[in-house]
Amino acid sequence: MSSSKRIAKELSDLGRDPPASCSAGPVGDDLYHWQASIMGPSDSPYAGGVFFLSIHFPTDYPFKPPKVNFTTKIYHPNINSSGNICLDILKDQWSPALTLSKVLLSICSLLTDANPDDPLVPEIAQIYKTDKAKYEATAKEWTKKYAV
């Protein structure tokens, strides 16, 4: 199956069975460039926020993972100021059996359960580990400022 057929199938599957609190689709006519949105999980400091992501599929998708970046600023130990996401399935744990829907759900999980032991932003990870209340307060503040 060509990458464009696979991406079109995932788009149709997403339309039929969208993951909870996520949406995604192509930007204009470009099947290889999508925009997604994730609602901040209610049990996280990101509750009430809507976070936008940019998704670029490589031409050899699904054999290579999509490039997914936050375009909304977010305070998180695994997401840096450029919107890069530290998530194993977007790197060495990628498998062609994974879909964009599963990727979005994994990113949602990351918002609820950060991984401070594999941080992209060590300073935030340190605050997360030593002063969780301060971390949550700052994350809520950023959510209000950038994602509401």
UniProtKB/Swiss-Prot annotation:
Subunit structure: Component of the RSP5-UBA1-UBC5 ubiquitin ligase complex composed of E3 RSP5, E1 UBA1 and E2 UBC5.
Keyword list, A-Z: ATP-binding, Isopeptide bond, Nucleotide-binding, Phosphoprotein, Stress response, Transferase, Ubl conjugation, Ubl conjugation pathway
Pathway stated in the Swiss-Prot or TrEMBL entry: Protein modification; protein ubiquitination
Any one Gene Ontology cellular component term annotated for this protein: nucleus
PANTHER family: UBIQUITIN-CONJUGATING ENZYME E2
Residues recorded as bearing Phosphoserine in the entry: 12
Species of origin: Saccharomyces cerevisiae (strain ATCC 204508 / S288c)
Keyword Transferase tagged: yes
Induction pattern: By heat shock and cadmium.
EC number: 2.3.2.23
Protein name listed in UniProt: Ubiquitin-conjugating enzyme E2-16 kDa
GO BP term (any one): protein polyubiquitination
InterPro entries reported for this sequence: UBQ-conjugat_E2_core (IPR000608), UBQ-conjugating_AS (IPR023313), UBQ-conjugating_enzyme/RWD (IPR016135)
Keyword Transferase: yes
Modifications made to the protein after synthesis: The N-terminus is blocked.
